[in-house]
Regions:
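Structured binding elements
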Residues: 111
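Short, contiguous pre-domain boundary segments
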Residues: 21-31
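Short beta->alpha connector loops at strand-helix junctions that form conserved
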Residues: 117-119
Length: 128
């Protein structure tokens, strides 16, 4: 396993693409990636550079990153128009459709907590 250890050191060691450092989180030392994005919103925004690349394939449907961002922006605007904003929670009870991801990104990129729920639950289970 010497090669594996060497690869890990090259990737996570000083100057590596995934360099790991120790940071302070509320007084607790935590290992973290030096170049990690600050939040999930930044992760989603970083994908704008792939505008014309395929983001999602579902059956015969294909969605580029640009199209996904347009839809996410539209969903976020709709949520805001409904009075849903930062700090609120939105339940997502849906099968594994592309729209699940789009709603998720719309929520977390605007400070809304996305709460994934099992789409097979009964109404009583969801209400609980």
């Amino acid at each position: 396993y010497a090669e594996l250890a060497q690869a890990r050191e090259e990737l996570t060691g000083p100057g590596g693409a995934f360099e790991i450092v120790t940071i302070d989180v509320r007084g607790v030392p935590v290992r973290a990636y030096r170049n990690a994005l600050p939040d999930v919103r930044a992760l989603w925004q970083s994908t704008r550079q792939f505008a014309e690349r395929t983001y999602i394939v579902y059956g015969d449907e294909r969605l580029t990153y640009r199209e996904a961002h347009d839809r996410v922006d539209a969903i976020a605007a709709w949520l805001a128009a409904q009075g849903v904003g930062r700090g609120d929670r939105v339940a997502i009870a849906m099968r594994n459709y592309p729209e699940w991801l789009l709603i998720y990104w719309a929520c977390v990129s605007t400070g809304i907590a996305a709460v994934g729920m099992n789409a097979w639950w009964t109404a009583a289970e969801m209400a609980y």
